[in-house]
């Protein structure tokens, strides 16, 4: 008889992988010969090939934000922010950068681009977008998404998103990403023509696979748990930072009272007046310095927020793997059931209770011709099922191989970026404390001269 189907637990196992390098700040994607282009992992996405745009070093920047008013899909007036994307070639003959393209994009178009990338590159940890509305704010920080300071931080975040995509070894070659940077008119139509919405996995299907998969890959299970814990840790860190910022702001501003009191005191003193006046001035400078300090802190908070949102990108890769594993297990079960049914027809023995067995007892046995016809149909279905299982197995192996390579690349990037951000934050705190020491040292000298 036919051999038993392979164990789904052992199907999606990759070989040893070499980690890839992390992204840089400038797009540098070298594309091979004109006819080299293939479709990425059979997903049906044309990679960028034979285009001189990618053969040069390109600087990408989101240089400006502008508030605009227009009509939305239901013909209602709305206010939104548009962002100016500029791409420049930095390999000009005289060494100067040359503007090649500039166009305006809304935040919703950035979202559309990322959703497309998530569907067509499910094995990639797709870079996240900056927050659409402010989170983890302290009382002085506005939660309004039209606030100029928030819009500026989001502009920086959108530029960082484009640089992340442009420096990714796979995403940078995508045709839709290229058109996002260069095609101002009808870009949405170009994206929708790819039909990516139809290929997106439903949330219900993904949730079903999460709970019903029988043999999940332990590495992806651990990765999902890690992403949950990473998100939790960074969330708590950002909440602590917001509370500290609130209190620090109050402490610094209260020092302004020193300045006012010293100034009032200096008015009634003759010999001590100048010293008190100078000390009060130093206290005023100290009190006002907190605004710039906390503005700089927001930069480091945004770096942490990026990896807060990266946690969801990691989970998206895990969900896709669970879906593929669940489909593989379902195909293996269907194949095993058909083989058992074929064996029962061939031997005339029924190993388990079935409706067919009951009808046979009630209405009599099938004729040999009917049995042979059913066996033939089942054998054809078994052959198709084996081919389908083999195809799903190969697809799953390729997904695991590519996904794990990108996860290793992401880990290197994460370790490097977070290390740099935390060190820079510590240096900034040290600098802030030194400035405080300097203020009080100056005040001491003022008191000494009285």
From Swiss-Prot:
Q: Which SMART domains match?
A: PX
Q: What terms describe the molecular function in GO for this protein?
A: epidermal growth factor receptor binding; insulin receptor binding; leptin receptor binding; phosphatidylinositol binding; phosphatidylinositol-3-phosphate binding; transferrin receptor binding
Cellular compartments annotated: Early endosome; Early endosome membrane
Domain PX, chain residue ranges per copy: 61-187
Enumerate the residue ranges of region (Disordered). Answer: 1-46
PROSITE patterns to which the protein is assigned, alphabetical: PX
Compositionally biased residues, Low complexity: 11-20
Q: Which residues bind a 1,2-diacyl-sn-glycero-3-phospho-(1D-myo-inositol-3-phosphate)?
A: 106, 108, 132, 154
Sites where N-acetylmethionine occurs are at 1
Q: Which InterPro entries match?
A: AH/BAR_dom_sf (IPR027267), PX_dom (IPR001683), PX_dom_sf (IPR036871), PX_SNX4 (IPR034902), SNX4 (IPR034783), SNX4_BAR (IPR037430)
Give the UniProt record's GO annotations in the biological process aspect.
Answer: endocytic recycling; positive regulation of autophagosome assembly; positive regulation of histamine secretion by mast cell; protein transport
- Per its UniProt record, what Pfam families does this chain match? PX
Topology with respect to the bilayer: Peripheral membrane protein
Query: Which cellular component, as a GO term, is one annotated location?
Result: early endosome
The signal peptide here is none
Please indicate which superkingdom the organism of origin belongs to: Eukaryota
Describe, as the record does, how this protein assembles with itself and its partners: Heterodimer; heterodimerizes with SNX7 or SNX30. Interacts with WWC1/KIBRA. Identified in a complex with WWC1/KIBRA and dynein components DYNLL1 and DYNC1I2. Interacts with BIN1.
The entry sums up its family as follows: Belongs to the sorting nexin family.
Its job: Involved in the regulation of endocytosis and in several stages of intracellular trafficking. Plays a role in recycling endocytosed transferrin receptor and prevent its degradation. Involved in autophagosome assembly by regulating trafficking and recycling of phospholipid scramblase ATG9A.
What does the record's free text say on domains?
The PX domain binds phosphatidylinositol 3-phosphate which is necessary for peripheral membrane localization.
PANTHER family the record matches: SORTING NEXIN-4
The protein in question is named Sorting nexin-4
Upper classification of the organism: Eukaryota, Metazoa, Chordata, Craniata, Vertebrata
